[in-house]
Design a protein with these regions (language model features):
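Outer-membrane beta-barrel translocator/channel fold
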Residues: 224-227, 253
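A short helix-to-beta-strand connector/capping loop
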Residues: 80-90, 216-221
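N-terminal, Lys/Arg-enriched amphipathic/low-complexity engagement segments
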Residues: 68, 72-76
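Small/aliphatic-rich secondary-structure junction motif
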Residues: 1-56, 159-224, 243-245, 271, ...
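A short acidic, glycine-rich active-site loop
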Residues: 54-69
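A conditional alpha-helix N-cap/helix-loop micro-motif detector
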Residues: 15, 95, 126, 171, ...
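Charged docking surfaces used in two-component/phosphorelay signaling
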Residues: 90-101, 227-231
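Gly/Ser-rich helix-loop-strand patches that form or flank binding pockets
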Residues: 103-153, 240-241, 245-284
């Protein structure tokens, strides 16, 4: 079955970079790429109670025309980058907020994964992803989200870091995309545990053994760092090994339970300099 990949775009350079990354990541796979531009009209917002323009009104039609014109230019650019018979392109323009447009497109087209990239709006060098991307990483739970920093240029992933505290029971379905990407690119999965004490509880050990069973057909290894704050420890590990991607399972309320005072997806999402694959907890 073809893989269906959603690529949100605002026609910026960082969005184009994420698109190119996705095309290269899935270069040899049969894929349908859905390019999505969610547009609004200046002074109006889907997220407020304000009345907003309807089809036929000048401001609405101008925004729609700009979106469609952006896609014409984008397709011209992509023809130069990617003349791949295995890839099929679809363009979608919609008057909606980004988050709702993504959720609607996932539902209507049975999307397998979202790939997007954006830089921080603040202009601060330390802020890699903007709030839109982090919001999608947290709130789009229907499928995995791969967020690509603007500074990243595609290289075939050779190593994917998977941080865990071993406190939750692993489910194969949660890890499908991590395993798929690792197998497809012959990448190693580096399972990283950051703790104050290196000893695992009986429950943690059982969960680690379950993870071993799930990862048994992949190349993987286990690593432990002690006396590190989690985000800093992850960053240090990645930088020391020149890893190519990081993958998380986003728990319903908070990454790693009580290990953090705020969700790790925000901490790593704002500051990561490599692609972040956010997978989601499966209840059953």
């Amino acid at each position: 079955m073809d893989k269906r990949i959603l690529l949100p775009t605002d026609f910026s350079k960082n969005a184009l970079n994420a698109i190119r990354y996705a095309l290269d990541l899935y270069q040899d796979q049969v894929c349908e790429f859905y390019f999505l531009n969610a547009y609004q009209v200046n002074g109006y917002s889907i997220d407020t109670m304000m009345m907003f323009p309807e089809p036929g009104e000048p401001s609405y039609e101008a925004a729609k025309k700009a979106s469609e014109g952006g896609f014409e230019k984008l397709m011209d650019i992509l023809e130069l980058h990617n003349d791949n018979p295995k890839h099929t392109f679809h363009t979608l323009s919609t008057f909606n907020s980004l988050l709702y447009a993504i959720k609607d497109t996932i539902a209507k087209n049975d999307i397998n994964i979202v790939v997007m990239g954006t830089k921080g709006e603040t202009g601060a060098a330390s802020v890699v992803f903007g709030t839109n991307t982090v919001n999608v990483m947290e709130k789009v739970t229907e499928c995995p989200v791969l967020a690509v920093p603007e500074v990243v240029r595609f290289v075939k992933p050779k190593e994917i870091v998977f941080p865990t505290d071993y406190k939750s029971v692993f489910k194969r379905k949660e890890l499908n995309y991590l395993i798929e990407i690792a197998k497809y690119h012959n990448a190693f999965i580096r399972v990283l545990h950051i703790v104050r004490e290196s000893d695992l509880s009986h429950e943690q050990q059982a969960n680690k053994e379950l993870l071993e069973a799930i990862l048994k057909d992949t190349s993987h290894s286990y690593h432990t760092l002690t006396d590190h704050k989690v985000p800093a420890g992850i960053s240090a590990f990645i930088e020391s090994r020149d890893s190519d991607m990081i993958a998380f399972i986003n728990k319903k309320h908070n990454f790693f339970g009580s290990m953090l005072s705020k969700p790790l997806v925000k901490e790593m999402g704002y500051h990561s300099k490599i692609p972040v694959l956010t997978m989601h907890e499966v209840s059953q």
